[in-house]
């Protein structure tokens, strides 16, 4: 039986990764079908267990990923790592601490923000000011995607005009990875772009996902003009 997970995320985010790969290939003039096959091969190697590999084969690569589906967290991480290896090469960075140093994982999050602002979360973006979106809609999106418990640990504090600090407590969550934080940086950056913010900068100055972290809290410093 394919492995299941008690901790899942909304399938639209995973669907967005596939659409990001398609868009990336189009922008770079790559053969999408061949690239997807290479990513699939790499993902199956990275799956870690036969059960997870079977899940990827049957539910992710062979089935239809619906926006309303719930998909285990680990699927996203495996796909992001496989995509980075294929598109950027073995050893390419999987994470970043700043929007000023974008990685492929950052760009995947950024792409999803722009896409979802025009699709599944259009009402949560429409007519919002950046600070209004960060304090309300951003939390609502995470609640929708990751559940009430995760979203209840969010703290969004205004630190000045065009300056917000976001604290996310990952305690009790499935083992987190800096890749997750990088997609969050990208999502925040893309959302601010969509909302018309000028010169947005997202810095992840405290990360609870790195090995040896004393706590599970992640802090994102967000500024714009």
Regions found by a protein language model. Name each.
Residues 3, 7-11, 19, 143-185, ...:
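Short terminal or interdomain "cap/linker" segment that borders an active site or interface and mediates
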Residues 25, 192-193:
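Residue-level preference for well-ordered alpha-helical positions
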Residues 51-183:
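Amphipathic interaction/junction segments at domain boundaries or subunit interfaces
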């Amino acid at each position: 039986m394919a492995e299941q997970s008690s901790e899942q995320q909304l399938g639209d985010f995973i669907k967005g990764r596939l659409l990001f790969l398609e868009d990336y290939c189009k922008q770079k003039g790559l053969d999408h079908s061949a690239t997807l096959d290479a990513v699939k091969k790499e993902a199956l190697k990275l799956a870690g267990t036969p059960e997870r590999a079977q899940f990827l084969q049957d539910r992710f690569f062979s089935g239809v990923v619906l926006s309303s589906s719930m998909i285990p967290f680990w699927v996203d991480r495996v796909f992001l790592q496989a995509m980075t290896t294929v598109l950027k090469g073995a050893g390419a960075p999987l994470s970043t601490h700043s929007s000023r140093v974008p990685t492929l994982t950052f760009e995947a999050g950024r792409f999803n923000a722009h896409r979802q602002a025009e699709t599944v979360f259009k009402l949560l973006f429409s007519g919002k000011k950046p600070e209004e979106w960060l304090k309300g809609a951003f939390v609502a999106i995470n609640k929708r995607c990751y559940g009430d418990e995760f979203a209840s640990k969010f703290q969004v504090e205004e630190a000045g005009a065009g300056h917000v600090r976001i604290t996310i407590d990952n305690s009790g969550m499935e083992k987190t990875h800096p890749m997750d934080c990088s997609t969050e940086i990208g999502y925040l950056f893309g959302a601010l772009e969509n909302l018309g913010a000028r010169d947005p900068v997202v810095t992840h100055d405290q990360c609870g996902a790195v090995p040896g972290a004393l706590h599970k809290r992640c802090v994102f410093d967000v500024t714009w003009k």
